[in-house]
Structure formats: C-alpha cells, structure tokens
Amino acid sequence: RSVDATPNQIRVEAGSRDYYRVSASGVVGSGIALSAQTSQYGGYQDASGYDQQKATLRIDQEWGGWQVDGALEGSQLDQETAGYIRGYEAYEDDQARKENPNPEAYRNAWSGRGHIGLTRDWGDSSELTIRPFWRSNSMTFLQHYLPWQATETNRHHSLGVQMSARGTQNALSWLVGIDADHTEGGLVENQADFFSPNQPDGIHYDYDVDADTVAAFTHLDWSLTDRWQIGAGVRLEDTRYDYANNASDGAVCAPTASACRFYRPADRKDSFSDWTGNLSINHHTDATTVYGQVARGFRAPQTTELYRLQAGQMAADIDSEEAESVEFGIRGAGNTLSYDLSVYWTTKENVIFQDRDRFNVSGAETTHRGVELAASWRISPTWALSGNASYARHRYNSDIQLLGSRDSIDGNDIDTAPKHFGSLQLTADFARYNVPISGELEWVWLS
C-alpha cells in the first residue's frame, strides 16, 4: 500500500475465542506512513492461541530525479500451538476437537525486512529500477508431533539487490533484469531428554549454510493487433550452497544403536543451475479476454533436504524439481458481473521425497489437472456476491518407494491434495447512506 493510500485510522476488532486486534495507520510526514497492529487469539483448542505484533514504515518520495519507494517491516509471534487430536473420526466429536494432547507445544518467531526502490527515466520511453533489500528471521519451536520432542531453531539473514530496465518501442514492451542474493542461515535441533538409543538426547543437527543466488531474466510483450498479444519470457538462475557442519560428522547415536535416526553429513558445497520460461497468447474483445499459456518452472532443493539426513544417508544426491504446465482460460467483465474461468494441466519431474529407507531422493513424477472459477456479481450498490471454486486431480505418475507405502502408487491420488475447495462471500457496504458500516458473510469448503 502506497503512502497516499494509507488511511489515517484506528481500528478495533473482536471475535469469538478471545480474539482481539487493534491496528492504527496514518501519514506521519511528507511521503512517510506508519502502520502497526497487535492481536491475540485464545485458540479453539485448550491451551492454544497466539500474541502477534506487526509494524511497517513506508516512504514514497523524490530525490534528485529518482522516484524512491521503500518499506521497513517487522513482526513478532508468540504462539501456543496444539497437537493433533486422536481417534477414528475424532474431528466429528465437538468435545474432542477442543482437546489439546500437547499443551506444552509452542512456536516463537520474529522477522524483519526492508527494501528501497530507486526508479528514474532512461531515454525517451524506458526506465531503470534498482532495489536493494534485506531480510532476517528466526524461529524456535517444539517438535511436539514427534515422540522425542526435540526443539528446533532455524534462522537466516539475507542481503540482495534487484536491478531491471523496462521500456516500450512501438508495439513491443520489454523487460530485462538481474537479481542477486546472499543468505547466511543455520539450523540447530536439540533434544532435552533421552528417548531411545536411536533417538538420543543432545544435539541432533547444528549447521550453517551460506547461499548465493544470481539470476538474469527478460520478458517481451508484443501487440500483434489491437486484439492479439503475445508474451514470452525466460529466466536463468544459479544457486550455490556452502554447508558447514558445526558438530561431529556421521551418525548421532552410539555405535550400538540398531537404527540411528539422525545423520550429519560432512562439510560440502552444492550448486544448481536452472531456467524457467513462459509463452502466452491473448485475444481481447470489448468485454472478454481469451488466453493460453505454456510455462516451465523449477525448485532448487531446500537445505534441509540436502543436509538434514536420516537413517545413515551420508549424502543426498538430488536435483531441482521441474514443472511444465499448460493453461487456457477466459475472463470477462461487465457492469455488474466479472469472471475468470481457466483449465490447466501440469506435470512435475524430479520430485523430491523420502523413500522407504528415509533417504531424501528425487525422481518422482506427478500430474495435476483442474479447472478454476472466480466470479463476482454486484447485486446492487450496497450488496455484492463473489466466490471462487476449484476442482483438481493430483496423482502420482511413477512407481516410487514412498515412505509409508508398500505397493505401487503409480496412478494413485496424492492424499494431501484436496480435490474440491472454494469460498462464497456476501458483502454489504452502507457508505452510500453515509453510514460507515460494512459486513461480510463467508462460506468456505474443502474436500
């Protein structure tokens, strides 16, 4: 939200289960805005809930021919988390839903980030933008979902810069840029009490990782006619990890342990080079747009997938996940009705997973097909109805030895991916009657 769009207001909210939130915002100087909020929630389970604070300082100014916009943000979270309820169809029991098997569970986290963008004209129809940024966060929580209940602390601190130039020449719009990011992170997992020879007390993991990422990208939009438009883009990215183990290498357990759960790999370096791309075509009329797009994406392995190993795995030989997708759709807008309907098909390759030996490996394939709809209807100047819905099938497309499976899962649905979900909102705004009251009734479903 820009400085000009920041309202001068104080807002107080209250809800069920001891939910309260107080927020304030306003312009505090020329091109400077400040907003802050504090909230608390009692939770619907016993001994659960959170306290959270957030603050944002934003600037929008002009300095020496440069248009400057930036923000400094911070947040703090103290949460009493809750364990999973137990029992067959326990979620249907009103009393069981409120129980908390792990009242000792908690999560404490803080984060901060800042960025400042410098933009100026470059030539007759181009502009240059330089945006340095900083981010920092840390989180400590109890792994209450595991019987041995270790405590984990993870953190990372980053500095980077995004540089881009964009312009327009006749029917062609173009964008080129470079991103660079240096991150220093780490993780410590410590177990206070002895559980078994295979899950001993003490330090399980203690490591630092320096990550450097450099990327170059470009994107073009070409208006063939007033109604036809083609877009294309590509991004090349290189990520390098420098991992340092701060504890002893190898298994955490004593040599007599039958199946040690934790393994600390030796210091190592890893690198991943990947590319993404997209090609789209759009046809516009006065009221509708028909569009199609093909795209390729990737995800480099996470540091925990590479260095937080188990069951004697000495090294994780994994590569980046890849995804290819095709999408077609139609969107339109009229005086009272707007909609966006799309269908998509996606395949993912080199999917990273834990096999039956608890090794982190890659090579799985999945397919994802679905249809999505978003629509809104302005019933009257006061009342509006909006909603979205999705139907999708997510399936394994390879015969992998997934952790917890015994037989072939090729063709099986991915049980953690819902088939149907959506929401419906009925809103009312009485501002036209000079009454500063608005309300919303929402229905959400997931299956």
Where are these regions (language model features)?
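Repeated loop/turn-to-beta-strand initiation elements of outer-membrane beta-barrel proteins
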Residues: 30-34, 65-68, 125-128, 171-174, ...
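Transmembrane beta-strands of outer-membrane beta-barrel pores
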Residues: 14-18, 38-42, 63, 74-78, ...
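Solvent-exposed loop segments that connect transmembrane elements
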Residues: 82-100, 142-149, 190-204, 241-270, ...
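Membrane-embedded beta-barrel scaffold of Gram-negative outer-membrane proteins
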Residues: 23-30, 127-143, 282-297, 307, ...
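Flexible loop and strand-edge segments within Gram-negative outer membrane beta-barrel domains
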Residues: 41, 48, 67-115, 137-156, ...
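Transmembrane beta-barrel wall of Gram-negative outer-membrane proteins
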Residues: 16-40, 45-82, 104-127, 168, ...
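Structural signature of Gram-negative outer-membrane beta-barrels, strongest in the C-terminal barrel
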Residues: 170-181, 207-346, 378-380, 427
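Gram-negative outer-membrane beta-barrel transporters
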Residues: 223-230, 238, 338, 343-348, ...
